[in-house]
Swiss-Prot record:
The record marks 423 as: Interaction with the viral RNA. The keyword Transport applies. Residues 375-398 have a biased composition (Basic and acidic residues). Residues 368-398 are annotated as: Disordered. One of its GO terms (molecular function) is DNA binding. It comes from Red clover mottle virus (RCMV). Keywords: Capsid protein, DNA-binding, GTP-binding, Host cell junction, Host-virus interaction, Inhibition of host innate immune response by virus, Nucleotide-binding, RNA-binding, Suppressor of RNA silencing, T=3 icosahedral capsid protein, Transport, Viral immunoevasion, Viral movement protein, Virion. Pfam families: Como_LCP, Como_SCP. Residues 363-369 are annotated as: Involved in tubule formation by the movement protein. This is RNA2 polyprotein. The record marks 406-407, 782-783, 972-973 as: Cleavage. GO terms for cellular component: host cell plasmodesma; T=3 icosahedral viral capsid. The keyword DNA-binding applies.
């Protein structure tokens, strides 16, 4: 063993011992004694063990010597210690990359129609299958069926071949195939694999949408079987796999049943060029009259749940979805099943020389919860039933008694209770027409039409007029199409505005009327104007009576007069329709205003005279404080809503409207700056946007994103302070080149802040009195999620008792409407403040949510022992004597006291309530004070704040809010406030009862 065959030594009796059988040939030698090493005995066991241990030690020493020499060689040549291991790992990974193969399961694994030996029998000829000669129950599998090339286009439709093209059979009287009941009549499609080989670059971004469509279905919900999104990159194949589980008849249309529709959204190949090649793999099973397919558990349990998949060779940018349209029990209950079987034609003998052909009775049967669409069948179809059923209907009480109906018409199923809205073409849905006179001497600010919308729409006799008047629920928007045909050498700007309600002698300025829904129109640029709106901003439906009782208002105003005066007065025609577009609510939520806040804030009119002279126009973006007028401010709902926050920021989207003749040309640049900027040429170093209108271009939108503003800014500024010191941004405009034309007139632009995107509001705003003037050189202006501060109240009412009165007194605050009424005593000092909460409650047409109220009562300086005054407070929803109180408080605390409470505004219109509306008998919320001693309780302040659940919708047109000096203003830190408080005295425009 191991080369030691010559190892010999003496042992016992001087005999030579040899340890190898190789020398057994010397067994007859007289001097030697041979024995087998593996022969175990008690005498030689320890010798043999020692010999084996010696051999093992020798091998270990030899191995260590070899490893030492190899380590010295590696160190000598400088080979890193981990190189061999890394190469081994790379070789292991490389050897694991098997060749690409079809991923679709073979047909034998999808079905279990045959035994194992029968499947082996079919393996030999499965590649040469003639499906027309196969019997039923035979598994078939086709690989790499050519589906054609994928062409570079937006949408591409490719046929999915299931089998090779079937050869047309020659008609013959002989049948050499299988018997009729055994031959295949249909093919069950178990799996389809769509293989795409792309010709595009392997590093491109081309994506494709794929949709497997069953063309025998006409409705999309049934036709679409699988949807995929896959990358179309070159290199390895992309494979989309699905399991249709569909039986297809064996006829000439078998290869037209399924189609793959491709959508290539970012294709950059030349139009019509070859983008890739498509091939199809299919596995299925034939069926016949006597034998069907038997799916395997793999197909029914695993692959059926897996549905559509994408074999990923190109990464993970793949998506797949299998559609299903299984009906629910409710859908089945609404279906109507109609059965009809025609009678049999037979010949009957009527005499010895004559006979007739007659048809027996036809069968009709209906299953369903509702009557079929053809509710009254044709008389010809029911003729047999009417003649045969001459005895009438059997009475269910007594089978021997027959009840004869008095009418053949089912009155309950004539659809006389149809509540749907008028629908159809424009001719069918037009319900009113109004002509508005446009005078030839028209100037900016002229009111062309101001009326409640009901008065404009009622009294017409168009097709839909009566239908609209008799419909309780109209779900479509109101659509108005206006037409004027003006020459292009003139021009003007008309504003068509609608608002949910109005009060008193409201302002008709475009700032006030244009905050809800409006459109600005220059008839010289476009000959017609299409305007749609929802008259119920907090709901999805309306009615004509709803418009009448809520005083929904329509205004047509001239914003900018004629560029060139026409020779005669002009008539504008307004046609009114019920739109097929559904009404969509527009609700403003105080707690979660949303990312996009629609403002429709009129920023001002910019006039640039012709010539090369230039000037700077600035429009403040502190837009919460309203617009200033003489001794008053103009306010609308959206600006009051923004003023609830102390600061705000977002992306500002402006609409720039051309209001002069298209023949007057100019290029205007817009940029963001700060107040007090001097005019200089380098102002265009600011990031700016150049506006240049085309011939008939009427308007353009520009956006200044959040990146233009370093921080948020205030929604209100002190109107008495200097413009340069408010620290808020301005929208600036100036002429880039010059203004010129072949006709006279200025280049006029109207600027509107349409919406604020990505809106963020910060903090609550107690409010600032007053606002900067609207118009002039500075074209005007002033304003969630939201970071707010709880506990900030806005003072809305301040009442001081008469100094000469020594008895009891009473007054009432309309918490929603903003008015104050007193008893018959004179000398009351009443002040209603224009705070953000008060402005929003007055200008918002519809309100819903919780309002928190704080009442502060201040008394005169008398001793506690002399205090005798008691104040009773009554919270009511109506001032009628027949109405009950909602809550009552009694306060007799000497000196001063504070009362805090809350109430919920809830109404009939999707939870919203309108102030003092005739619709649904809506009222308001009133807080009535009854003071037993007005000389001791002398001053009352009512403050309010809105809960985060408070919502508003729609605008109420209001008169200008008065701003007058008040000598009775409460001092602040011992000094009179520099900003005068707003004062409403009983009998003034706002203090009296609400106008009708």
């Amino acid at each position: 063993m191991l080369g030691i065959s010559n190892l010999c030594r003496y042992y016992q009796g001087q005999r030579r011992v040899c340890a190898n059988k190789f020398y057994q040939k010397y067994v007859n030698h007289s001097d030697l004694y041979f024995f087998d090493l593996w022969e175990i005995s008690a005498n030689n066991l320890w010798i043999k063990l020692a010999f084996v241990l010696l051999l093992c030690l020798f091998e270990i020493i030899s191995g260590l010597e070899y490893l030492g020499k190899m380590a010295q060689e590696i160190l000598k040549q400088g080979i890193p210690a981990n190189v061999l291991q890394e190469k081994a790992n790379l070789f292991k990974k490389a050897s694991a990359n098997n060749k690409i193969k079809d991923e679709m399961p073979n047909a034998l694994s999808l079905y279990q129609n045959h035994s194992f030996f029968q499947k082996l029998k079919h393996l030999a000829d499965k590649k040469n299958l003639d499906i027309t000669s196969l019997p039923g129950g035979r598994e078939v599998e086709y690989k790499h069926l050519d589906a054609g090339h994928l062409l570079a286009d937006t949408n591409v439709v490719i046929d999915v071949p299931l089998v090779p093209q079937l050869a047309a059979r020659t008609p013959t009287d002989y049948n050499f195939g299988t018997s009729r009941d055994k031959s295949a009549t249909a093919l069950h499609v178990g799996a389809i694999e769509v293989v795409i080989q792309s010709y595009a670059s392997s590093e491109c971004d081309l994506m494709a949408g794929m949709m497997l469509v069953d063309t025998f279905h006409s409705r999309p919900e049934n036709a679409i079987r699988s949807v995929y999104i896959v990358p179309i990159r070159g290199g390895m194949f992309m494979r989309a796999l699905c399991f249709p589980n569909t039986l297809v008849p064996m006829d000439s249309d078998i290869n037209n049943r399924f189609k793959v529709v491709f959508s290539l959204p970012n294709n950059d190949f030349p139009q019509g060029s070859k983008l890739g090649h498509v091939s199809i793999n299919m596995a299925g099973c034939t069926t016949s009259l006597s034998k069907t397919y038997v799916p395997s558990p793999l197909l029914t349990e695993e692959l059926g749940r897996e549905a559509a998949t994408v074999i990923q060779y190109l990464g993970r940018d793949t998506y797949a979805m299998q559609t299903s349209n299984v009906p629910t029990s409710d859908e089945i209950s609404r279906m109507v099943f109609n059965f009809h079987m025609e009678g049999k034609l037979s010949m009957h003998k009527t005499g010895s020389l004559s006979s007739i052909l007659s048809k027996s009775k036809s069968l009709r049967y209906t299953i369903g919860g509702s009557k079929p669409k053809n509710k009254l069948a044709d008389k010809a179809h029911n003729e047999e039933a009417e003649t045969s059923d001459s005895k009438g209907i059997i009475d269910p009480k007594d089978g021997n008694v027959f009840a004869n109906p008095q009418t053949d018409t089912d009155l309950f199923k004539l659809s006389l209770d149809d509540t749907s809205s008028p629908k159809g073409s424009l001719l069918d849905t037009r319900f009113a027409q109004k002509k508005v006179l446009i005078p030839k001497a028209m100037a900016g600010g002229a009111d062309l039409l101001s009326s409640n919308l009901y008065d404009v729409l009622s009294g017409s006799s168009f097709r839909a007029s009566l239908a609209l008047a008799r419909t309780h629920v109209v779900e479509g928007k109101i659509r108005c199409i206006c037409t004027i045909n003006l020459p292009e050498n003139t021009g003007c700007c008309l504003a068509i505005t609608v608002n949910s309600s109005n009060r008193g002698q409201f302002s008709t300025d475009i700032y006030t009327t244009g905050s809800q829904d409006r459109i600005l129109w220059n008839p010289a640029c476009s000959k017609n104007c299409d305007f749609s709106f929802n008259p119920n901003p907090c709901g999805t439906a309306w009615s004509l009576e709803f418009l009448r009782r809520t005083k929904f208002h329509l205004s047509v105003t001239c914003v900018s007069g004629w560029s060139a005066q026409p020779q005669t007065d002009i008539a504008m025609t307004m046609d009114w329709y019920v739109s097929n577009k559904p009404c969509v609510p527009c609700i403003y939520n105080v707690g979660t205003p949303g990312q996009n806040v629609w403002v429709n804030r009129w920023m001002g009119k910019l006039s640039f005279p012709q010539g090369s002279q230039n000037q700077l126009k600035q429009m403040p973006l502190a837009i919460g404080g309203g617009a200033g007028a003489k001794n008053s401010i103009l306010m609308n709902m959206t600006n009051a809503f923004l003023s609830l926050w102390r600061y705000f920021h977002g992306d500002l989207v402006f609409e720039v409207q051309k209001m002069s003749s298209p023949f007057i040309k100019s290029t205007v640049t817009f940029f963001i700056g700060f107040g007090g900027l001097p005019f200089s040429e380098n102002l265009e170093d600011f990031p700016n946007k150049l506006i240049q209108f085309g011939e008939v271009q009427e308007r353009v939108e520009i956006t200044f994103t959040r990146k233009e503003f370093l921080t948020a800014w205030s929604t209100q500024v002190d109107p008495a302070g200097p413009v340069a010191g408010d620290g808020c941004p301005y929208l600036c405009a100036m002429v880039h080149d010059s203004t010129a034309s072949t006709i006279t007139g200025d280049f006029n632009l109207g600027v509107t802040l349409l919406r604020i995107e990505n809106f963020v509001g910060i903090g609550r705003n107690p409010g600032i009195q007053g606002a900067r003037l609207l118009g002039s050189m500075q074209a005007e202006a002033q304003g969630g999620v939201v970071r707010t501060t709880d506990g900030v109240y806005s003072t809305c009412f301040r009442v001081r008792t008469p100094l000469a009165l020594k008895d009891s007194g009473s007054f009432t605050c309309d918490l929603i409407g903003g008015g104050i009424t007193t008893d018959s005593n004179t000398g009351w000092n009443l002040t209603a403040l224009n705070t953000p909460v008060a402005n929003l409650l007055r200008t918002a047409a519809w309100k819903r949510g919780t309002i928190h109220v704080q009442v502060a009562m201040f008394g005169s300086t008398v001793k506690r022992s002399d205090w005798t005054s008691t104040v009773q407070l009554f919270l009511r929803q109506s001032m009628n004597t027949s109405s009950y109180d909602a809550r009552v408080w009694v306060i007799s605390k000497p000196g001063a006291a504070i009362l805090e409470f809350s109430f919920d505004v809830e109404g009939p219109n999707n939870g919203f309530e309108m102030w003092e509306a005739n619709w649904a008998s809506q009222t308001s919320w009133f807080l009535e004070f009854l003071i037993s001693n007005v000389t001791q309780n002398t001053l009352f302040e009512v403050s309010m704040k809105l809960d985060s659940n408070f919502c508003v919708a729609g605008t109420t047109l209001m008169p200008p809010f008065s701003v007058t000096a008040s000598p009775d203003s409460r001092p602040l830190l011992g000094v009179k406030t520099s900003t005068p408080a707003k004062k409403y005295v009983g009998g003034s425009l706002q203090a009296g009862p609400s106008p009708d």
